[in-house]
A protein has these predicted regions:
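Transmembrane alpha-helices and adjacent helix-loop boundaries
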Residues: 2-393
Length: 393
């Protein structure tokens, strides 16, 4: 008769790493849940004592205040929801313009930092060392108070060809207004783009089959010019221009870029471009010098060598840190509250919050907006980074 003896049961002991791991995780979860419940209960209690009701119904109330700049129609009787949309559009406007201008200026300064010309090299170096070491808020305040607010009044504004007028009220310029032929013109642009894509595919297949090249650039350019031009001849001009004119103490008609927008955009562009310049410089220097020598040995001049050989390879190094600078620029747009530009923070998290008292809802919406903008920029740049990544076989 055989007796089977099972393995002895292990007792739970604090010295067992698995027991400690489970215990610490349980304690952490309980602590986080308890803290969350305390904050929620405390917030609800304080709001009840102050007579504040939670929820997003306040977005339907009338705002009752004016906004200096709005990209869509707005009156003081419109709702807080429309104020939110205006703040969002103004934030996106500054971010998009700033990203484009900072990228262009940053690339120019970055290439200038590597110029063999002593004067250009030193000027670019001074630019980088000065502007990247001054806080962006101080730069915004400088451009606003020391530059744009010191401009003359509209009656004595700087006149540029009776078309552009620069004064302390901002930059007045002609406005492009849609005419009857606008939508047919838009349709013609879409048709031209589709035609260019189809032509490019056909040309590539033809080249692979016969080896005979096709002038895709000139053919595509002709399509983009001829099709919209024919549409304009048939349906008329897509736009007509409204010129600004002085009436009383200010200009009427046309578009106006308010001083707050000009100061914010210029400051963020100059500040961010200094960092982008260093990213571009380091990216170019990361490319082996042998690539430059090989291009020169083929008879390529320095300009085409930089555009067609060096920059495409340097982009793989430039794009990741460039993404961070785009994110910083979008988030730094919130500094506009310092000069009263009506973007998300100053307009929605400032004026709307003060009038409604819905602090939790307003701040949550504002944080969600900046989070969505940052994630969108990251996804777009990551997608582009994968497109240009070096594929090894």
């Amino acid at each position: 008769m055989q007796t089977q003896i099972g393995a002895p049961k292990q007792k739970l002991s604090f010295s067992d790493p698995k027991v400690r791991a489970w215990l610490f995780q349980i304690i952490t979860i309980v602590a986080v849940v308890s803290l969350g419940w305390y904050l929620f209960h405390n917030t609800q209690t304080n709001m009840q004592h102050r007579g504040i009701t939670s929820g997003f119904d306040f977005l339907e109330r009338s705002a009752g205040f004016g906004i200096a700049q709005h990209l869509i129609d707005y009156t003081e009787s419109d709702s807080y929801a429309r104020v939110f949309v205006i703040g969002l559009l103004n934030t996106l406007l500054v971010s998009v313009i700033g990203v484009v201008l900072a990228t262009l200026l940053g690339f120019i300064i970055g290439v200038a930092r590597l110029s063999p010309n002593w004067m250009i090299n030193k000027l670019a170096t001074v630019y980088v060392e000065v502007f990247r070491n001054i806080p962006p808020l101080l730069q915004i305040l400088f451009w606003y108070f020391a530059v744009f607010l010191t401009m003359p009044l509209p009656r004595n504004s700087h006149n540029f060809g009776d078309t552009f007028f620069m004064s302390s009220r901002g930059l007045n310029m002609p406005a492009a207004l849609a005419s009857e032929g606008f939508w047919p013109f838009v349709a013609s642009i879409v048709i031209a783009i589709v035609a260019v894509v189809l032509m490019t595919r056909w040309a590539n297949k033809r080249f692979e089959a016969t080896g005979v090249p096709f002038h895709k650039f000139w053919a595509g350019l002709a399509l983009l010019i001829v099709i919209p031009a024919l549409c304009t001849l048939v349906f008329g001009a897509p736009l007509h221009w409204e010129m600004p004119r002085l009436a009383g103490f200010n200009f009427v008609g046309g578009w106006v870029l308010i001083p707050e927008l000009l100061a914010l955009t210029l400051a963020l562009t100059v500040y961010t471009a200094a960092f982008i310049a260093e990213i571009v410089r380091s990216g170019i220097q990361s490319v082996s010098h042998g690539q430059t020598e090989a291009a020169h040995s083929l008879g390529m001049r320095p300009g085409p060598t930089l555009r067609k050989v060096i920059i495409p390879q340097a982009l793989r190094v430039i794009i990741p840190p460039l993404t961070s600078q785009y994110l910083n620029l979008a988030k730094n747009s919130s500094l506009a509250a310092g000069i009263g530009y009506p973007e998300m923070v100053s307009l929605f998290a400032g004026t709307v919050l003060n009038q409604t008292g819905q602090a939790i809802e307003v701040i949550a919406i504002t944080m969600s907006v900046y989070l969505a903008i940052s994630i969108s920029i990251s996804l777009l740049m990551n997608w582009y980074n994968k497109r240009i990544a070096l594929i090894e076989r």
